[in-house]
């Protein structure tokens, strides 16, 4: 799965790609060709402690 800052190109890679939102993150899933999976964002604030 790729982690991208923008999913605009990722959703246009294949005609079966679809954008879904799960747990506050945006994913591109493609059941017919799973190598096109992608997720937007990845950096989260870590706790100091």
Swiss-Prot record:
Record has Glycoprotein as a keyword: no
GO BP terms, alphabetized: translation
Family (UniProt): Belongs to the bacterial ribosomal protein bL36 family.
Key words, A-Z: Ribonucleoprotein, Ribosomal protein
InterPro entries registered for this protein in UniProt: Ribosomal_bL36, Ribosomal_bL36_sp, Ribosomal_L36_bact
Pfam families, per database record: Ribosomal_L36
The protein's name in its UniProt record: Large ribosomal subunit protein bL36
Gene Ontology CC: one annotated term: ribonucleoprotein complex
GO molecular function: structural constituent of ribosome
NCBIfam families, alphabetized: PRK00831.1 (NF002021), rpmJ_bact (TIGR01022)
Top-rank lineage group of the source organism: Bacteria
Lineage of the organism: Bacteria, Pseudomonadati, Pseudomonadota, Betaproteobacteria, Burkholderiales
């Amino acid at each position: 799965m790729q982690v991208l800052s923008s999913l605009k190109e990722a959703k246009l890679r294949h005609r079966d790609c679809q954008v879904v939102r799960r747990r506050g993150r945006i994913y591109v899933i493609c059941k017919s060709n799973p190598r096109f999976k992608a997720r937007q964002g990845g950096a989260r604030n870590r706790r100091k402690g």
